[in-house]
Amino acid sequence: MAAVSVYERPVGGFSFDNCRRNAILEADFAKKGYKLPTARKTGTTIAGVVYKDGIVLGADTRATEGMVVADKNCSKIHFISPNIYCCGAGTAADTDMTTQLISSNLELHSLSTGRLPRVVTANRMLKQMLFRYQGYIGAALVLGGVDVTGPHLYSIYPHGSTDKLPYVTMGSGSLAAMAVFEDKFRPEMEEEEAKQLVSEAIAAGIFNDLGSGSNIDLCVISKSKLDFLRPYSVPNKKGTRFGRYRCEKGTTAVLTEKVTALDIEVLEETVQTMDTS
């Protein structure tokens, strides 16, 4: 019996069905004069630095909704565990829910092991979760903490990649903040020096990026203490008015005046009460 060989195209691991669907939707919307929604730019400046005895994390407090300032004093430094905190940039809902979920899982891990969690454990949980969602969770994070092995600082990207560095910045104002770090960072800094450096880095992001603004929050973590400084400084303090800037009536000359009579149609309405007896 002759064998029948039928060629079958190998099935790849990626499905392009949604790509074809999006192309059809885009063509259909274009006929009606509509455009598909585009990715929305988010704005934030977050940073962290390792000093001699621990970690200093910093963030601005402006939340934006497109080109509108939605909140002037939101907190972007999230609790993970008593010895670990995390700064979040990107989509506010994603950063909030992601850090809350990891904080809960880390508390269960701590109860199971009977000791404080390590920073590398939180980093592994975050990177595995974000990689699983392939970047669709818009959470760019700066994770910092102190455990039995010393201070640790990580940057975690939305796709799941991570870096361990002595100083990190993320967000739309990260370039300005990184310029300050590369100019003034040095190893084995004292706490006050580290706080001042992070404050200057966040201020650089605030003054050079429209998506960052308002106040500067800091979180200082060491083996002996935890300081949450909110706000640490207010670089954009509103000025005080020293006088009344109102012109008296008649100050501006009226060059021409035209009065147009309007035809108004008056309608009369009567309401008849309903007999309920």
From Swiss-Prot:
Enzyme Commission code: 3.4.25.1
PANTHER family, alphabetized: METALLOPROTEASE TLDD (PTHR32194), PROTEASOME SUBUNIT BETA TYPE-7 (PTHR32194:SF4)
PROSITE patterns recorded: PROTEASOME_BETA_1, PROTEASOME_BETA_2
Family membership noted in the UniProt record: Belongs to the peptidase T1B family.
Pfam families assigned: Pr_beta_C, Proteasome
Superkingdom of origin organism: Eukaryota
Keywords, ordered alphabetically: Cytoplasm, Hydrolase, Nucleus, Protease, Proteasome, Threonine protease, Zymogen
Compartment(s) where it occurs, according to its Swiss-Prot or TrEMBL record: Cytoplasm; Nucleus
GO molecular function per UniProt: endopeptidase activity; threonine-type endopeptidase activity
Enzyme class: hydrolase
Active-site residues, record numbering mapped to chain: T44 (nucleophile)
GO cellular component, one term: cilium
UniProt protein name: Proteasome subunit beta type-7
Catalytic function, reaction form: Cleavage of peptide bonds with very broad specificity
Subunit structure and binding partners: The 26S proteasome consists of a 20S proteasome core and two 19S regulatory subunits. The 20S proteasome core is a barrel-shaped complex made of 28 subunits that are arranged in four stacked rings. The two outer rings are each formed by seven alpha subunits, and the two inner rings are formed by seven beta subunits. The proteolytic activity is exerted by three beta-subunits PSMB5, PSMB6 and PSMB7.
Gene Ontology BP, a term: proteasome-mediated ubiquitin-dependent protein catabolic process
Propeptide residue span(s): 1-43
Function recorded in the entry: Component of the 20S core proteasome complex involved in the proteolytic degradation of most intracellular proteins. This complex plays numerous essential roles within the cell by associating with different regulatory particles. Associated with two 19S regulatory particles, forms the 26S proteasome and thus participates in the ATP-dependent degradation of ubiquitinated proteins.
